[in-house]
Structure formats: C-alpha cells, structure tokens
Amino acid sequence: MGECIFCRIADGKIPAAKVYEDDSTISFLDIMPANKGHCLVVPKKHYETLLDIPDEDLKNLITVTKKVVKALSLSIGNGSYNLVMNNGKEAGQLVAHAHIHIIPRFKSDRLRIKWSHKKYTDKEMKDVQEKIKKFV
C-alpha cells in the first residue's frame, strides 16, 4: 500500500518517534496526541481493520500494546490509560490501516471519552443477543 502513511512509516520512508519495533509491529508517538505519551501500535503489514488481521498477528499486536502500556506507565504515566481502536469510517477511523491508540490518562487532563447511554427494552436485548450468538 504505497500511499498508506502507516505503511510508509513501517518501511522507514517517513520518520516517526518510534518507541518500539519488531519484525511485525511498530509503535510510535501520535503526531496529534490526545495526551502526553499518546502512542499508536501498528502492524507492519497492511490490514484495514481488526477483522482483517490474522490471529497470530493480532496476538503480537496485543502483546506489543501491553509492552508499550507498561513502558508508558513506568516512564511518564500512573498506570491509567485508554485503549482505542477505531474500525471503519463511522467509528472515526481516519487512516485505513488497523492501529491501536494508547492514551495515558492523568488526574487533571480533562480528556473525556463519553457517549450518550441508550437503553434496551427486554425484547430488544434478547433479539440483539440472539442475532450476535448466531455468528459467534
């Protein structure tokens, strides 16, 4: 994917403030961070969303995410963080290359990840539950 910015970072064609790299995964500071230390964890192979990532690569992505979370917690954080993965336009995915945001949280950061809570009727909950269970 020659035009994908994350592929170009993984190939070393665009500089990034890398905090971790191995054969399959790279992590670097977000250039427009939500908070100090905001990192992205990105598979080097181009996968658009979570569902495109083979299980073995997904295991490595999560393992690297945990390593970077630990490093952030020990270096600049306090152990509080959000993990965010936007999949698809409607979910806010801006770069069509799967990635996980690690956003360290601080007591006075005023950052809020909030949504309006909805409520199911008993019937709606049962219907949705049954629809999902058919495909799991």
Feature locations, PLM:
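HIT superfamily nucleotide-processing domains
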Residues: 1-136
